[in-house]
Amino acid sequence: MTHQSHAYHMVKPSPWPLTGALSALLLTSGLAMWFHFHSTTLLTLSMLTNALTMFQWWRDVVREGTYQGHHTMPVQKGLRYGMVLFITSEIFFFAGFFWAFYHSSLAPTPQLGGHWPPTGITPLNPLEVPLLNTSVLLASGVSITWAHHSLMENNRNQMIQALLITILLGIYFTLLQISEYFEAPFTISDGIYGSTFFVATGFHGLHVIIGSTFLTICLIRQLLFHFTSKHHFGFEAAAWYWHFVDVVWLFLYVSIYWWGS
């Protein structure tokens, strides 16, 4: 093993960035095949290669940080900066959807009937399933904070309970969102209202699924004694991401469901 006189982790050559990029290419190609030719073969293959890449890449990161001790304080600081920049990029990603929504709703064109929601669109009642979804996500924000505080206090059992509650609330939110989509009286092809509604809420739903997966991995790692009160950036990053998902939903609820209806 070569000697190094610095605290930074010099990452070994890894195949996972390459397989990840190829999997992403397969995923986008598979989606195009599914949309235009109704074939899910390439999409299924891409999901499999994506899952294998993520599992093996994250496995290597866990080995480097938990078992080999490569995640020193400067390395953790860099990871924190990376996560902050990632969440910032996600904020701008959703800002584009809000821009599209407000651009269309604040000055409706004559083609939309000159008012919002457009003529012929029956919006969802914001006081029914959307309000329940809001309550579920806010409750999950409380439980993830409870899990974080329990971890800081070395209370292992409470941390596991709170994290499990958060994951279950995330799954419940996803199921409610799916049921809402099936019951919606409009579709993604119903003009600007349908497209902005389903794209904005759909991408948020995708982020909830990603966040739930992130938290499930953290739960497994906690069960395997990977986290301590001093060394748990994986969980901290997941908690940041979950709070971001919470805040985005509040903006979606106020803008699209409540004001937009």
Swiss-Prot record:
Similarity comment: Belongs to the cytochrome c oxidase subunit 3 family.
One Pfam family recorded for the sequence: COX3
Localization of this protein: Mitochondrion inner membrane
Superkingdom of source: Eukaryota
Entry EC no(s): 7.1.1.9
PANTHER family registered for this protein in UniProt: CYTOCHROME C OXIDASE SUBUNIT 3, CYTOCHROME C OXIDASE SUBUNIT III
Subunit structure of this chain's protein: Component of the cytochrome c oxidase (complex IV, CIV), a multisubunit enzyme composed of 14 subunits. The complex is composed of a catalytic core of 3 subunits MT-CO1, MT-CO2 and MT-CO3, encoded in the mitochondrial DNA, and 11 supernumerary subunits COX4I, COX5A, COX5B, COX6A, COX6B, COX6C, COX7A, COX7B, COX7C, COX8 and NDUFA4, which are encoded in the nuclear genome.
Function as written in the Swiss-Prot or TrEMBL entry: Component of the cytochrome c oxidase, the last enzyme in the mitochondrial electron transport chain which drives oxidative phosphorylation. The respiratory chain contains 3 multisubunit complexes succinate dehydrogenase (complex II, CII), ubiquinol-cytochrome c oxidoreductase (cytochrome b-c1 complex, complex III, CIII) and cytochrome c oxidase (complex IV, CIV), that cooperate to transfer electrons derived from NADH and succinate to molecular oxygen, creating an electrochemical gradient over the inner membrane that drives transmembrane transport and the ATP synthase.
Gene Ontology CC terms, in alphabetical order: mitochondrial inner membrane; respiratory chain complex IV
Topology with respect to the bilayer: Multi-pass membrane protein
The UniProt record lists the keyword Ion transport: no
The keyword Membrane is assigned to this record: yes
Chief location of this protein within or outside the cell: mitochondrion
Entry's Gene Ontology BP terms: mitochondrial electron transport, cytochrome c to oxygen; respiratory chain complex IV assembly
Intervals, Mitochondrial intermembrane compartment: 35-40, 106-128, 184-190, 257-261
Membrane-spanning ranges: 16-34, 41-66, 73-105, 129-152, 156-183, 191-223, 233-256
Catalytically driven reaction(s): 4 Fe(II)-[cytochrome c] + O2 + 8 H(+)(in) = 4 Fe(III)-[cytochrome c] + 2 H2O + 4 H(+)(out)
Keywords linked to the UniProt accession: Membrane, Mitochondrion, Mitochondrion inner membrane, Translocase, Transmembrane, Transmembrane helix
Record topological domains on the Mitochondrial matrix side: 1-15, 67-72, 153-155, 224-232
Single GO MF annotation: cytochrome-c oxidase activity
Protein known as: Cytochrome c oxidase subunit 3
